[in-house]
Amino acid sequence: MTDATPTLTPKPWISGIAPYVPGKSAGADGRPLIKLSANENPLGTGEKARAAFAAVQSAPDALSRYPDPGSVELRAAIAAKYGLDPDRVICGNGSDELLHLAAGTYAGPGDEILYVRYGFAVYEIAARRVGAVPVEADDRDFATDVDALLAAVTDRTRVVYLANPNNPTGTLATREEVGRLYAGLPQNVLFVIDQAYAEYLTPDEDDGGLELAKTRPNVFVTRTFSKIHGLAAERIGWGYASADVIAALHRIRLPFNVTRAGQAAAVAALGDDDFVNRSRAHNARWRAWLAAELESLGNHGVRVVPSATNFLLVLFEGAVSAETVYHRLMDAGYIVRWLPGQGIPQALRMTIGTEDETRGLATAIRAALAG
């Protein structure tokens, strides 16, 4: 008779999670590359945020003291900037933490979490992490299809994620579409509007998400300081929802989740309109330029998906594949994001870089297509 030795195993739904693969910054040989794979701000970080960050770091107790667990000053600054109630603002270790909190607070085994195909990769991870069933609704030519999302809602749906603008496609759902989606959802479903790229939009493009979150009990809007504010290294996100939703999220939020220096830098960043405006203008100019350059390569099977973000999704549907272009770009010193893991093996996602980086990328793509 043999005694069975118990084995430590993770929950089955954890084993089903494919590890998140971040954008690379170096080649396989360790050679530094021009990184256009993670949608970072090519202008860096604003002077005000850098000065505030440095001031905290230079304090004698910079490392020995815990940060403010409630991010009180930062929440007040966010509320003042956007006309919100500071008690209904929550800060996170990046907006990723807040997206996970939404799933962990409102869904569990047997529940369903819904999002559009080609949505942000974290949504599936957040769903599986809590044992919920991830459900993908069909897209409409890489854009959000509201009718498909509503058709996928069941009595087990507990959370609906909408990235707007969407990552990795760059597409934007209109205010009318977002309102129609919300109107079609049951009131026991949390509608999460992930606005990581909202600061790149013009006022006319605003999707009305914050207005919904101000007045509706089941809408949670998330934003980040990682993109236009250039604070990606500090991992700072924030969200807004009803008092009841925020109170529930706080029950499982980790204390001390945003660093002291990060909080100070974020407060300063909110007051640096000049840097934000310069970043937005730079992005609009060079996104349009790069899109036009790549659209001129249509005879090579190149197609650019219209973008409202700081990146382009580019389809390679001709003789030279996206995978081939990806590797040839690395050989030329550029790293972009190839997307087979998100079901788009024919596509590359390209961050808008500096002028020199963007011009160089266009030249390298032409060379890659020429073989």
From Swiss-Prot:
**Subunit composition?**
Homodimer.
Residues folding into a coiled coil are none
Which family is it part of? Answer: Belongs to the class-II pyridoxal-phosphate-dependent aminotransferase family. Histidinol-phosphate aminotransferase subfamily.
> Mind telling me which InterPro entries this protein's record contains?
Aminotransferase_I/II_large, HisP_aminotrans, HistidinolP_aminotransfase, PyrdxlP-dep_Trfase, PyrdxlP-dep_Trfase_major, PyrdxlP-dep_Trfase_small
Catalyses which reaction? Answer: L-histidinol phosphate + 2-oxoglutarate = 3-(imidazol-4-yl)-2-oxopropyl phosphate + L-glutamate
Q: Which SUPFAM superfamilies match?
A: PLP-dependent transferases (SSF53383)
Q: Which superkingdom, per the lineage?
A: Bacteria
Provide the positions where the record notes the PTM N6-(pyridoxal phosphate)lysine: 227
Cofactor (UniProt)? pyridoxal 5'-phosphate
Q: Which GO terms describe its molecular function?
A: histidinol-phosphate transaminase activity; pyridoxal phosphate binding
Q: Which UniProt keywords apply?
A: Amino-acid biosynthesis, Aminotransferase, Histidine biosynthesis, Pyridoxal phosphate, Transferase
Query: Any idea what this protein is called?
Result: Histidinol-phosphate aminotransferase
Tell me the CDD domains matching this sequence: AAT_like
Q: Which NCBIfam families match?
A: hisC
* EC category: transferase
Q: Which GO terms describe its biological process?
A: L-histidine biosynthetic process
State the EC number(s): 2.6.1.9
- What is the residue range of the signal peptide feature? none
Pathway per its UniProt entry is: Amino-acid biosynthesis; L-histidine biosynthesis; L-histidine from 5-phospho-alpha-D-ribose 1-diphosphate: step 7/9
